[in-house]
């Protein structure tokens, strides 16, 4: 499993890629990328729902956590900011990823 971290003005995109099938036990070993905790986090990647939940929990201390849905944008699922749960951030992750990424 690898992560790409892309800093944007108002949030940090954490995009993950899974290279082979994973099992829940991997959660004990995942080292999540560090982020600027003054900005929210958008989580993106194809994987099991339990992985998305795990990552959302790990970043709960940031101003907000949003999960990317390619049909909608980034849906806010947790917030300690002016954004509210259910707000949608207009973002196209595929376009951001084209601009180059740093894998961690």
Swiss-Prot record:
Origin superkingdom: Archaea
Similarity-based family: To A.aeolicus AQ_377.
NCBIfam families from the UniProt entry: cas_csx3
Full protein name: Uncharacterized protein AF_1864
Source organism per UniProt: Archaeoglobus fulgidus (strain ATCC 49558 / DSM 4304 / JCM 9628 / NBRC 100126 / VC-16)
């Amino acid at each position: 499993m690898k992560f790409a971290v892309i800093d944007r003005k108002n949030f940090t995109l954490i995009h993950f890629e899974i290279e082979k099938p994973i099992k829940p036990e991997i959660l004990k070993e995942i080292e999540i990328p560090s982020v600027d905790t003054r900005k929210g986090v958008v989580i993106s990647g194809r994987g099991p729902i339990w992985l998305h939940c795990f990552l959302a929990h790990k970043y709960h201390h940031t101003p907000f956590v949003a999960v990317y849905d390619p049909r909608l944008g980034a849906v806010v699922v947790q917030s300690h900011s002016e954004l509210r749960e259910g707000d949608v951030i207009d973002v196209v992750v595929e376009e951001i990823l084209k601009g180059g990424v740093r894998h961690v």
